[in-house]
Amino acid sequence: MNAQLPDVSVSQLPCNLSPLNWVGMQHIDLPTVIDTANQTVNTKVDVYVNLPKSSVKGIHMSRLYHLINHLSVLNTMSIKSVLKQMIDSHQDCGTTAAKIVFKFDLLLKRDAIVSTALSGWKSYPVIIEASIINELFNIEYKLDISYSSTCPCSAALSRQIIKNGFKADFSSQNLIPSADIEAWLEQYATLATPHSQRSIATVVVQPFDYAHDINFVDLIDSIENTLKTPTQTAVKRADEQAFAKLNGENLMFVEDAARRLKMLLDQKYKFWSAQVVHQESLHPHDAIAVAISS
């Protein structure tokens, strides 16, 4: 039936005879299974091939869509296979390169810090970008992880205010009963509080080899364990108190967070980058630091 329908991509030459670097489609909806997380996710897919032949008006988007629509499991092998098929399906266009981008949110169940049998779901945005260019396969993984950061400078300034308040109230006493100290702290220990904020670590990694798939859960866990203050889901007061303690024990400038991630990623990946953004509560702008593998 299609043979009887006009196809201007074949019958009409382009007015401007020139090759194109990438042509394709964006935001294709696709349910996929993430092997290493044992989870089905709603994925947005971008697909591209190059168009080297200037005599060809356009690519075959329906062929690309058909190939993507049959992709059900996301792992290195399946992604590499579909990239090869994308190139093979466009030999009449002279295609030598293909690129594919997967975007999805990975949902992980997270336990409360202290409370038993209390948990909630946390979303982690993930991007997988892979390509074959001149027969060379490349793949990288990008994740966003939210955490809390408390400013060390603000903490020091807050401590000074509390210290000065304590001295002002008790400077005339040589011996201070412990009950009086407890009562004072109960009322005035928050004369000043350090500013803290939700923060985002964006990590991009490439594995040492492509024989093994990235385990997203392991990577996320290692990043959160390194930063120490991941944002929480379900909490009770005991968990909120434990979270406050974690923040107090892990005061961080953006530089501190970036260096923590550098130490972690240097040990695990060949190529990587880490960007940390602290969405300042003190300022209307953000603080940012970036570290990249050498």
Curated annotation (Swiss-Prot):
It comes from the Bacteria. It holds the Pfam family GCHY-1. Its EC number is 3.5.4.16. Keywords: Hydrolase. The record marks 151 as: May be catalytically important. Pathway: Cofactor biosynthesis; 7,8-dihydroneopterin triphosphate biosynthesis; 7,8-dihydroneopterin triphosphate from GTP: step 1/1. GO terms for molecular function: GTP cyclohydrolase I activity. Belongs to the GTP cyclohydrolase IV family. This is GTP cyclohydrolase FolE2. It comes from Acinetobacter baylyi (strain ATCC 33305 / BD413 / ADP1). The lineage of its organism: Bacteria, Pseudomonadati, Pseudomonadota, Gammaproteobacteria, Moraxellales.
